[in-house]
């Protein structure tokens, strides 16, 4: 796909004179354009849901969720991956973010790395990619060689693959088994795909990882019941989670959490089923860690 023909490289008439307006009007123009992004994502919800189901099936079978991108797209993947262990208590490495140029590229522009097909393949080889894994290639343009080559390699291994881009019919979309293509239109600053395209990608990644965690039993109601208490704020959140899930008071919630080494799921089952920590944990294990199943089937 030629660069000049890409929607993400087009000129936005709404911002054609943004350099001549007041600061407040600049903000209004940007905000008005940003309002269109959730609607673009809404149009591809069926594609996102299909990807979530595939990701969940593979992860349930022992696979991993791998994000692969360059520049802003790579950073968004790393951001999403890095939040999964503290929020949902999963092991580091279950959700992996890879960026062209490696760790240095998280904070710095590393010229030319996104054009390296070998880089995309080698980064996947270095994490010992297997057919159980799901590779999600992220590229606003849909033409990034690093991502395309990684998706091709993943498919050769038998991996399920997802391509996220903002240009219809892009190489990323056609290379991946599942395509998610929110069309956000031309950017406020021509070609600055960190803006609307980046926002759309972030919304999609939020859904992919959150959907996976909900389907994996990491959410009860709308509570993050596997949150790891790594600071005082999260200690308080754990207490509130147990309170909200059970109707008990703060003292009862804290006592249950202490008794089970601060595992929210176990504490919730302890309170709701009037069990000690060992028995509550046993029942959770019997039902794959799903609180709902413990409550509904016993």
UniProtKB/Swiss-Prot annotation:
**Where do the SIS domain residues begin and end?**
55-218
Q: Pathway, per Swiss-Prot/TrEMBL? A: Amino-sugar metabolism; 1,6-anhydro-N-acetylmuramate degradation; Amino-sugar metabolism; N-acetylmuramate degradation; Cell wall biogenesis; peptidoglycan recycling
User: What Gene Ontology molecular-function terms does this entry list?
Assistant: carbohydrate derivative binding; carbon-oxygen lyase activity; ether hydrolase activity
Q: Output the CDD domains linked to this UniProt entry.
A: SIS_Etherase (cd05007)
What triggers its expression? Induced by MurNAc 6-phosphate that releases the repressor MurR from the DNA. Repressed by MurR in the absence of MurNAc 6-phosphate.
* Active-site positions on this chain: 83, 114
| Cited function | Specifically catalyzes the cleavage of the D-lactyl ether substituent of MurNAc 6-phosphate, producing GlcNAc 6-phosphate and D-lactate. Together with AnmK, is also required for the utilization of anhydro-N-acetylmuramic acid (anhMurNAc) either imported from the medium or derived from its own cell wall murein, and thus plays a role in cell wall recycling.
- What binding partners and quaternary form does the record give? Homodimer.
Source organism: Shigella sonnei (strain Ss046)
Report what the protein is called. N-acetylmuramic acid 6-phosphate etherase
This protein's source sits in the domain of life called Bacteria
The UniProt record's further free-text remark is: A lyase-type mechanism (elimination/hydration) is suggested for the cleavage of the lactyl ether bond of MurNAc 6-phosphate, with the formation of an alpha,beta-unsaturated aldehyde intermediate with (E)-stereochemistry, followed by the syn addition of water to give product.
| Disulfide pattern | none
EC code: 4.2.1.126
Presence of keyword Transcription? no
Q: Which NCBIfam families match?
A: N-acetylmuramic acid 6-phosphate etherase (TIGR00274), PRK05441.1 (NF003915), PRK12570.1 (NF009222)
Query: What gene name is given for the protein in this entry?
Result: murQ
